[in-house]
């Protein structure tokens, strides 16, 4: 992950261990990230009867996004790491609209995606990206539908008790870590250059641009 952050994000990102970024409420810092251990990976493949490795598709986005500035480069780095343990990845891409359509239809084996939050609420990540409902033509590209996870995120979105929501989302992050429906690689740091004569512009945490209080001097 550190190598990817350096090469793909030019250092403008942090290694991820949870779906939501560490700046969002409900973040569970007690979750331990997976260690980089190729020998253990080989042992697990052998245990699964795949000692000689296997081939798999790795879909890479054809566009540059705030959460992934160079998906092709990231895919190549993942491909190289997988090759070290005997997994041969074929990088696949399509035009962006076709990519999204095919991914929603579940045509991929593994697919690279990302997310920019819409409202600052953990539900916008957990339910939007990994709920059972979202696995059916939604944004749950992993197609993962897991009842113990669902039993945490659905009550969390239904209550207005903030402390209860925090507790439920922290538990949900543990479940995601243990089940691993996706490997969360990085949380990007987004920069917005502003000329010195522009006054009153504030960077929006949700990626929007507000100009009502902006002036030029």
Range-by-range predicted roles:
Residues 76, 80-84, 89-90, 157-158, ...:
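Conserved C-terminal helix/tail region of periplasmic/extracytoplasmic solute-binding proteins
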Residues 25-40, 50, 102-106, 127-158, ...:
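Short, solvent-exposed loop/beta-turn-alpha elements that line the ligand-binding surface or hinge
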Residues 1-80, 84, 145, 152, ...:
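Append "and occasionally in soluble cytosolic enzymes with long acidic Gly/Pro-rich linkers
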Residues 58, 80-134, 168:
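Periplasmic binding protein-like
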Residues 6, 48-66, 107, 111-115, ...:
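Bilobed periplasmic-binding protein-like "clamshell/Venus-flytrap" ligand-binding domains
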Residues 15, 27, 64-67, 98-100, ...:
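Flexible loop/turn segments at secondary-structure boundaries
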């Amino acid at each position: 992950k550190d190598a990817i952050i350096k090469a793909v994000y030019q250092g403008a990102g942090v290694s991820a261990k949870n779906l939501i970024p560490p700046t969002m409420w409900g973040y569970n810092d007690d979750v331990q990230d997976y260690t980089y251990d190729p020998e253990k990976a080989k042992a697990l493949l052998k245990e699964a009867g795949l000692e000689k490795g296997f081939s798999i598709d790795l879909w890479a986005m054809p566009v540059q996004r705030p959460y992934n500035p160079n998906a092709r480069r990231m895919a190549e780095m993942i491909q190289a790491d997988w090759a070290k343990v005997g997994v041969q990845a074929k990088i696949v891409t399509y035009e962006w609209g076709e990519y999204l359509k095919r991914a929603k239809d579940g045509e991929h084996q593994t697919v690279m995606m990302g997310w920019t939050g819409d409202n600052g609420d953990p539900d916008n990540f957990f339910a939007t990206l990994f709920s059972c409902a979202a696995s059916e033509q939604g944004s749950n590209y992993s197609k993962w539908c897991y009842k113990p996870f669902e039993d945490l995120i659905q009550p969390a979105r239904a209550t207005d008790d903030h402390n209860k929501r925090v507790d439920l989302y922290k538990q949900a992050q543990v479940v995601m870590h243990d089940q691993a429906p996706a490997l969360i690689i990085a949380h990007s740091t987004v920069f917005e250059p502003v000329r010195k004569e522009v006054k009153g512009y504030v960077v929006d945490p949700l990626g929007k641009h507000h100009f009502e209080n902006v002036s030029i001097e």
